[in-house]
């Protein structure tokens, strides 16, 4: 029994150290930006020997990969998440995903910094994040939207690309250099609710007017 307890304690300590490294990456990213993500600074912030980065993650790239996976909203979405009832051909689910993304990025400063990093520097782990997003998105499109929109499925995908990127931009804009966009204060509950209503309206209009089949 004591041996099992000791083994469990060791595993907990290992998990705690790994989490310290991931938290350190997030803290540095939030406060200093991606350019400050150096192995010595990460180890110092985590309070763990830098050699353990190689033990737990195989090196800096492995650490960055795991951190990015933990923060990116769309990389977490997989075909297994498409469990809801799709009698409406994904209309409600599309709204749910977009609104959840809007709130997630708004509340998560690390995700905001990750977006800036992604636009500022070529990096294998960031490219991998993009590839994972596309793979997950492709599965969702094929499983839910393409059968309903038929020959106009590409137009639906284009509309979704505009909505996803637009919501990213509105959050970044409100967080960095201003809050008023097209006369809407994006940092107030009222302003954000207005954007959310617009998203629901646009999804409804897409489903009502773009489909080649009757719901």
What function would you assign to each model-found segment?
Residues 66, 79-107, 111, 159-160:
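Hydrophobic alpha-helical connector segments
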Residues 105-127, 174-181:
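Amphipathic alpha-helical segments used for helix-helix packing
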Residues 39, 68-75:
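Short, basic, alpha-helical segments at the C-terminal edge of helix-turn-helix-like DNA-binding modules
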Residues 64-71, 129:
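Alpha-helical DNA-contacting segments of helix-turn-helix folds
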Residues 75-77, 83, 114, 122-149, ...:
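Amphipathic alpha-helical packing segments from all-alpha helical-bundle domains
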Residues 145-200, 213-215:
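Hydrophobic/aromatic-rich alpha-helical bundle segments in the mid-to-C-terminal region
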Residues 1-16, 211-215:
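N-terminal intrinsically disordered/low-complexity leader segments
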Residues 20, 24, 28-62, 66:
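Helix-turn-helix
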């Amino acid at each position: 029994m004591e041996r099992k307890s000791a083994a469990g304690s060791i595993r907990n300590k290992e998990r705690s150290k790994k989490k310290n490294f991931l938290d350190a990456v997030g803290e540095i990213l939030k406060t200093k930006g991606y350019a400050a993500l150096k192995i010595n600074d990460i180890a110092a912030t985590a309070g763990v020997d830098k050699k353990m980065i190689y033990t737990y993650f195989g090196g800096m790239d492995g650490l960055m990969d795991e951190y990015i996976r933990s923060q990116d909203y769309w990389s977490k979405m997989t075909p297994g998440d498409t469990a809801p009832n799709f009698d409406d051909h994904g209309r409600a689910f599309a709204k749910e995903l977009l609104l959840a993304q809007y709130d997630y990025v708004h509340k998560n400063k690390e995700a905001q910094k990750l977006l800036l990093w992604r636009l500022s520097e070529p990096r294998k782990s960031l490219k991998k994040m993009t590839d994972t997003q596309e793979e997950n998105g492709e599965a969702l499109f094929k499983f839910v939207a393409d059968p309903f929109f038929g020959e106009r499925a590409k137009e639906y995908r284009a509309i979704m690309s505009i909505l996803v990127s637009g919501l990213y931009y509105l959050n970044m804009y409100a967080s960095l250099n201003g809050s008023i966009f097209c006369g809407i204060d994006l940092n107030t509950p009222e302003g954000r609710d207005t954007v959310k209503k617009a998203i629901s309206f646009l999804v409804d209009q897409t489903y009502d007017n773009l489909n080649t089949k009757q719901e």
